């Protein structure tokens, strides 16, 4: 159609309302070397009554085919009954600017799809790891040598390609998700050989590996505003960009739509800037998924300034479905290295989400408010199911779960990094839920974070290794026996610094062990509100694994620092009143007023040196049992108080093997040491 409009210079064919000829308008509306097209010139009414599908489709298709800029009419309301689809080849610049206009779908069809079409051929290749000089220096680089016996289409360093194979992608959650990943050319050696420093995984090392050069199309979509009505059975996506290099979506907006809004499928370096959405219908039983931004098998997307209310996910990753042997390269692979910044999701089912196949997704300064348990979702502000994701300076308020990590579908080891995370929620809500997979190494690293909850437990951990530093947990629960950390099967908790604070209820603990075999190593922890506490560590099993706790309390505990632990439990080091020279577990003043045998406990003390001062008030007063030491070399000083009126006898017995009994007069003492099996005498 554009060719028909473009007449010879000076042509007077056709006159517009403003008196200009079509040719004059065509010549004057160039933009960066491309034509500027108006849907009105194609017959679009934009009056909210007429069906504008056909003229809009033709206008967009012309712009995509030849390279051009479409500018909608400010104030127009375009009713559409079918998809506006365009395909864009190499080297084209396409801009679709609908700022100030609105689209109203009248059928269950996608509003707009733009697909990049590679003009280069698909190449079947083999790969091998080699050392090659890719720069001007003398140091070689480990790279992938890619050989295409039938030839490839790459011509220079820096070009971007896509590789794929008929093997299922890593950590797939559907059996139709196949491996694929982009790469950057490092060196073109010949028409059949090139090199890349991108690391192809083992999924690409077998047969049937293919590559293609990603089209160099530039696509910009501005001001797309779509408003619909919730309709049972509707599920179509709104905007889908597929197979494009660095597409840019500027200020898209939606309201009351029935499926995903912005879909990035197999794109490289996409940007979505300031998207805004309200009320995305979520009905999984109908195939309707309220994804606001769906980042699908794309690489390095940047999503800035999400503002979304009432959706399944404000942001999510996914891996598209495809056939193992087709050449739809944009439908291959998983989402890699995307970053979501300054996002806000309110009243969503799970505001920010990643599916299992994703890798390296980063959320920075994102906020989730009021996420709830919706249809087929779990109510987490941040739901992380991929590997190597990170939450940086993020906040969840009143979400059912602040942040949830699960490795159920992860086929190998996985990690999550959390820094500067803040959570606040009512009773029944949980700050963190971390669930790993038995037999794998699932790690979560947390730093400089704070959460406050009225729930019985602030965190729940199962089959995950947690390393935390400077984490403050505030538990305001009135429920008896609450805890800042709940440690389950196969879990390890290591913390340094930070605090646990209690301000209501009674019988609380810093840590509650919910299963055998858990490991706890807590150092330099500040604990306030000890008047509301019963233990530092409450065990729900008789053997709790390896435990070491060092805490600074603001007052004494009513009993032992560890409750319900078996004799194999390790140790606790407790300080009180902010004064680390006062060690209640390291010193005990006792009285023995009977001639029976007495077994005394260390209260699980982990101090290097422990001192007991015992007052003996009856003849034959003796100690014939001591609970095990925390570690080899731990010392126990036992002294007979100057106030003793009788001798104090230390006998061989339970965990005591001195060779002979020791009798102590008033004011005398003995030093014992733990050798890993028994207490032995060191001096008298």
From Swiss-Prot:
Protein's UniProt keywords contain NADP: no
Assembly with partners or alone: Homotrimer. Interacts (via N-terminus) with depolymerase 1 (via N-terminus); this interaction probably gives rise to a branched tailspike.
Subcellular localization(s) per the UniProt record: Virion
One of the protein's GO biological processes: symbiont entry into host cell via disruption of host cell envelope
UniProt keywords, alphabetically: Degradation of host capsule during virus entry, Degradation of host cell envelope components during virus entry, Host-virus interaction, Viral attachment to host adhesion receptor, Viral attachment to host cell, Viral tail protein, Virion, Virus entry into host cell
Role according to the record: Functions as a receptor binding protein (RBP) and probably mediates the attachment to the host capsular exopolysaccharides. Displays a depolymerase activity that specifically degrades the K5-type polysaccharides of Klebsiella pneumoniae capsule, which allows the phage to reach the host cell membrane and bind the entry receptor.
Keyword Secreted: no
CC annotations in GO: virus tail
Designated name of the protein: Depolymerase 2, capsule K5-specific
Domain of life: Viruses
InterPro entries hit by this protein: Pectin_lyas_fold, Pectin_lyase_fold/virulence
Family membership: In the N-terminal section; belongs to the Przondovirus depolymerase 2 family.
